[in-house]
């Protein structure tokens, strides 16, 4: 059993299966609340404010940054993205588990702003397997694949910064391990 204050962070390199694990975890554990990110990007067709993202203008976003209103935030491709602190703290205060699926830099920020959270690093069984997974997606150019692989090398070096490491070799076993780690 793990002792933490309701905040669960899941991170790991691209292609490791974070998204699939999180979807299965949420399906089997509806009491866990997946944090909704804020962004300054324009909503895509069908996206709903407050469900898919909290859509803010840049001034609103920067005001929240200045007021320490985010557990973590970053700028990507000219837009800001962040995890609002108030919504996570509100859910935790009523006993809910809050899950963040974020990148390494975001996880490091959360460690500073919410050190009592529990952080899990999802790792591949090997770097070769990770490369195979990324390549078989068939969605990226060779340049994008190389970029993802270079970033993955850096991220894998950081795995010991986390409270737990789960190797995603077999999805069901990795999922079971995550459930054991966050059981309270």
From Swiss-Prot:
Transmembrane segments: none annotated. Gene3D superfamilies: Guanylate Kinase phosphate binding domain, P-loop containing nucleotide triphosphate hydrolases. It catalyses: GMP + ATP = GDP + ADP. SUPFAM superfamilies: P-loop containing nucleoside triphosphate hydrolases (SSF52540). Pfam families: Guanylate_kin (PF00625). ATP binds at residues 12-19. Keywords: ATP-binding, Cytoplasm, Kinase, Nucleotide-binding, Transferase. It is an enzyme of class 2 (transferase). It is found in: Cytoplasm. One of its GO terms (molecular function) is ATP binding. Essential for recycling GMP and indirectly, cGMP. Belongs to the guanylate kinase family. NCBIfam families: guanyl_kin. PANTHER family: GUANYLATE KINASE, GUANYLATE KINASE-RELATED. This is Guanylate kinase.
